[in-house]
């Protein structure tokens, strides 16, 4: 079957830059879906996305849909014929199929007609496939234009559809298909004739349009890095900003611009924020990570006088930097702590009080937590009291991303200790999955306190997160607490910290069972964390059964159990623990704590008792040092005496004293393993 390249390009007014790449991918996916449904094969595909166009190239597409057959079943044979004569049901089926009854297959249990459907020409199928793909694009809000009733993300301007070197005759979104595209708006305003689909990219390149999103992105990234190096700096190129800039230009030309050095007195985060978010510039840092008074803009034109473009961008950015400078100077006119007065009128949550109320709670809770993790209570309390002050500043009002960062600079300006200042920013860490953690113990204490206060407060008024709604980001808060404690190796008993947080709210929350509810929610987040790490859920549950209060201790136990499961003795010992657990659960009355050797009547009882005593002495110091892996490795040596015991000894002996003593022996055995985890749950 012959095949030809196919090209479709829809020209529009400027498309939303943040959505451009996803629109292109969705356009291709929709076309592939349509081609597959039509049974059309092809050898390759490529999507192109530029500010004024979406295009897809399909390589070596079948020019003819293959013929196919479908079987249509009719009535059962007993209903189709009576006394050898066709019934009305049989005749009706033949009429429905448009054939004589003689052409119907009568060899099976039912009448069957095999209908041959000849394939259609691909050119006749493509308009519907393209139209369906465009209709299925993820466009939140479509628009109409002029007198047209058509709707799309932006008004359409032209349409190219070529199968081989032939135009596919159709009209889509008010545009009649042809072979004429358009070049760069300034460099090549004339139409561009696309000779063949394979020449599409090069035809547009000659017209100063780089249609390939990936090519433009790579060019911008490479040229920006080169220019930064020439300025003895490194460019800040966030992937999302690079994508957005790529979507804004058809013919990218990066240029170096500058601003007055006096603006460097403003916190560089504020300058970077305004230049990235508002102007789409790439900022430059020196070797020490300090902002340079230069930036890179990406022009969409190759100017004969690039200085004009540079000066224009420098003129545009100056007022924005001046605003940031003004806010910074205004805020510094008063001590940071005085901004707490404004927060007394800002509601955190209607039932839980103001933002200032929250800051006071965080201060006390941070002071409680700090010494427990090796920090300073006084400095943590001070940082907690200042933690929300910058929310009332002019800087954060203009640049919300500066919360915490602004507080850091203002605290330093007021002469606060370095760790107190850092904690004002670190309280929000981690800001996302895998993001940076607090570096100071003061910051860690405030970050944990802030998150626990939110968890306890919101749970305490019954606003639990649902599957789809978590307006206070409680899941992220819980994961943040766990990450700080585990990855920073901070041994904090969360039970005490959560109970302290509950008491602070007083009558504002329903305290009964609240601490337990919050702790369960926090430790439940560990399940997903471990699953992501490839740790089996049974390992998590074996530790969860003991309900450790420390996240660090919990993690150390999980890692130990995971290592234990790789030992050859693990499976058998897990099964034995399960058997012992079942036996002990059926014991009548309390199980004795002491084992009495005088009731032994089998050598294997003595052997197991001796092995348990030796293991107990060995693992006690290990348990005290939380050497859980070593402890389980030592307990693995109990497999042989345990197996011998169960092969030779009937636990439920007729003699009540002998039976009770054997229960006590098995309880000692199980207690050794429970010092780490309930490995009976591993079976």
From Swiss-Prot:
Q: Which Pfam families match?
A: DALR_1, tRNA_synt_2f
Coiled-coil intervals, chain numbering: none
Please give the catalytic activity noted in the UniProt record. tRNA(Gly) + glycine + ATP = glycyl-tRNA(Gly) + AMP + diphosphate
Q: Which UniProt keywords apply?
A: Aminoacyl-tRNA synthetase, ATP-binding, Cytoplasm, Ligase, Nucleotide-binding, Protein biosynthesis
Localization recorded for this chain is: Cytoplasm
Spell out the SUPFAM superfamilies in the cross-references. Answer: HD-domain/PDEase-like
Q: Which residues form the signal peptide?
A: none
Q: Matching HAMAP family, A to Z?
A: Gly_tRNA_synth_beta
Q: How does it assemble?
A: Tetramer of two alpha and two beta subunits.
Q: What protein name applies here?
A: Glycine--tRNA ligase beta subunit
């Amino acid at each position: 079957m012959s095949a030809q390249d196919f090209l479709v390009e829809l020209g529009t007014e400027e498309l939303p830059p943040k959505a451009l790449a996803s629109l292109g991918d969705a356009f291709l996916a929709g076309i592939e879906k349509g081609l597959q449904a039509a049974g059309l094969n092809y050898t390759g595909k490529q999507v192109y996305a530029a500010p004024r166009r979406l295009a897809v190239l399909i390589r070596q597409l079948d020019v003819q849909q293959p013929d196919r057959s479908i079987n249509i079943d009719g009535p059962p044979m007993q209903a189709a014929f009576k006394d050898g004569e066709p019934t009305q049901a049989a005749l009706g089926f033949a009429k429905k199929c448009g054939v004589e009854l003689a052409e119907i297959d009568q060899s099976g249990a039912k009448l069957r007609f095999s209908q041959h459907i000849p394939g259609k020409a691909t050119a006749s199928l493509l308009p519907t496939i393209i139209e369906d793909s465009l209709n299925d694009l993820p466009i939140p809000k479509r628009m109409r234009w002029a007198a047209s009733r058509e709707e799309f993300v932006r008004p359409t301007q032209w349409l190219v559809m070529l199968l081989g070197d032939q135009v596919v005759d159709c009209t889509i979104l008010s545009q009649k298909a042809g072979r004429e595209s358009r070049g760069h708006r300034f460099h090549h305003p004339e139409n561009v004739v696309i000779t063949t689909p394979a020449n599409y990219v090069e035809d547009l390149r000659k017209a100063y349009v780089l249609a390939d999103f990936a090519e433009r992105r790579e060019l911008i990234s490479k040229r920006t890095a080169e220019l930064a190096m020439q300025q003895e700096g490194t460019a800040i190129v966030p992937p999302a900003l690079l994508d957005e800039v790529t979507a804004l230009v058809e013919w990218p030309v990066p240029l170096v611009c500058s601003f007055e050095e006096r603006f460097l007195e403003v916190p560089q985060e504020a300058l970077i924020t305004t230049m990235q978010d508002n102007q789409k510039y790439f900022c430059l840092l020196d070797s020490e990570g300090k902002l340079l008074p230069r930036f890179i803009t990406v022009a969409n034109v190759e100017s004969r006088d690039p200085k004009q473009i540079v000066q224009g961008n420098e003129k545009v950015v100056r007022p924005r930097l001046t605003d940031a400078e003004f806010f910074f100077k205004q805020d510094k006119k008063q001590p940071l702590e005085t901004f707490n007065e404004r927060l007394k009128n800002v509601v955190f949550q209607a039932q839980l009080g103001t933002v200032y109320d929250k800051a006071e709670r965080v201060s006390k809770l941070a002071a409680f937590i700090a010494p427990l993790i090796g920090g300073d209570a006084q400095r943590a309390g001070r940082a907690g009291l200042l933690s929300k002050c910058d929310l009332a500043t002019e800087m954060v009002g203009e640049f919300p991303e500066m919360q915490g960062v602004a507080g850091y600079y203002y605290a330093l300006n007021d002469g606060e200790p370095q760790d107190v200042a850092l904690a004002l920013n670190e309280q929000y860490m981690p800001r996302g999955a895998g993001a940076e953690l607090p570096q100071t113990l003061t910051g860690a204490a405030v970050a944990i306190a802030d998150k626990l206060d939110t968890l306890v407060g919101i749970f305490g008024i019954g606003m639990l997160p649902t599957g789809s709604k978590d307006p206070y980001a409680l899941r992220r808060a819980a994961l943040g607490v766990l990450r700080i404690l585990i990855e920073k190796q901070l041994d904090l008993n969360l039970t005490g910290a959560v109970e302290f947080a509950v008491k602070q709210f007083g009558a504002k929350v329903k305290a009964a069972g609240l601490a337990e509810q919050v702790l369960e929610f926090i430790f439940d987040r560990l399940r997903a964390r471990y699953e992501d790490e490839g740790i089996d859920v049974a390992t998590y549950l074996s530790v969860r059964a003991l309900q450790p209060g420390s996240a660090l201790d919990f993690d150390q136990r999980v890692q130990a159990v995971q290592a234990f499961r790789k030992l050859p003795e693990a499976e058998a010992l897990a099964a034995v623990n399960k058997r012992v657990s079942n036996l002990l659960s059926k014991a009548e009355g309390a199980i004795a704590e002491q084992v009495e050797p005088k009731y032994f009547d089998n050598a294997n009882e003595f052997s197991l008792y001796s092995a348990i005593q030796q293991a107990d002495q060995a693992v006690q110091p290990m348990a005290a040092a939380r050497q859980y892996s070593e402890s389980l490795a030592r307990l693995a040596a109990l497999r042989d005496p345990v197996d011998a015991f169960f092969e030779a000894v009937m636990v439920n002996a007729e003699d009540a004293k002998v039976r009770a003593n054997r229960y006590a022996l098995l309880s000692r055995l199980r207690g050794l393993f429970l010092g780490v985890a309930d490995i009976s749950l591993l079976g």
